Amino acid sequence: MTSEQYVLSFTAGGLLYHESITVAETYSKCRRWDETINQIIDQNLLQSRVQSTTVRKLREICHRLKGLSTEGIELLINGSRSEQNMLLWLACCKRYKLLAVFAKEVLHDKFIRLDFAMTVADVDRFMDAKSLWHEELENITDNTCLLYTSPSPRDKRQSRMPSSA
């Protein structure tokens, strides 16, 4: 077993694109995370119906964005949609080492082979291999594993790799 445990608090929000841009813009005005959090909650800038949803999403987004440099946050605000998506993907990979390793070991290999279909079996093989060294993965729920894939209308056991949105 390894001493470095994976952070497994994934959300079903994907990249949380719009919310992340809002948080980055708010942060860029004051450059203080505590003030950013208070302002977003007080003004309901994430436009959630329930405050607990705002707090949960905000906590997740702040963890991710704190991994970016000042220049990265500025590019997130002012960059193209493609640059923004890449930065949000980078922020997710920095926050979730398991996701970064998955991208490196599975997605990269599939891309090199021009295999653009992601299957549940691909995820299962990856998770099984990693659980040998990370006992925290032995108790991971099926829902967390499914965040790596989403059913395709053509084949319930296969999905397309995410487009980055």
Q: Residues of each region from the PLM?
A:
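DNA-recognition alpha helix
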Residues: 119-133
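Short, positively charged loop/turn segments that connect secondary-structure elements
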Residues: 129-145
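Positively charged, polyanion-binding regions of nucleic-acid-associated proteins
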Residues: 88, 95-115
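Conserved small/polar residues in nucleotide/adenosyl-binding loops
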Residues: 148-155
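Positively charged, low-complexity/disordered segments
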Residues: 155, 159-164
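Short basic-aromatic helix/loop recognition motifs at nucleic-acid
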Residues: 112-119, 144
